[in-house]
Amino acid sequence: SGMGLPFAALLIRPEYDIWKPAEHNGTFRGNTHAFVTARVAIEKYWADARFAEDIAAKARLLDVVLGEMAELVPGSRRKGRGMMQGLDVGSGDLAAAICARAFRNGLIIETSGNADQVVKVLAPLTTPEETLRRGLSILHEATRETMKTNKMAAE
């Protein structure tokens, strides 16, 4: 709902909307509290273009940091877009090691992918930029340290 309550919604262009009322079937539909908080979230965050501009700026920051991280991990690939991105490091063990090191330094971050090989960044859209910068700094350092440790172990 934008305020932490589960909310299912489907946005359809009017020209494609042929459904009748109640044909949209979502797990969290009909949650009155979520509808109320969703309305408040829309009124607060989407009243003008600032929220979208803030999201775009944070997404660009995420792009830059993931690009720097990709340079540290040979063969890695960036995935996703906007504020839903990740770095496919090619190995679930490597992704887990990066996430574990980040956790030890104060950042909770998860993996995804068919072999848990993607270090996934899925920060809330409302994350303050300074908080995002701190988290990405921890993640970048965790990646650098993990790769340094792996390189020394391989030698």
Model-predicted segments: where are they?
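Conserved N-terminal phosphate-binding loop of PLP-dependent enzymes in the Aspartate aminotransferase
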Residues: S1-E155
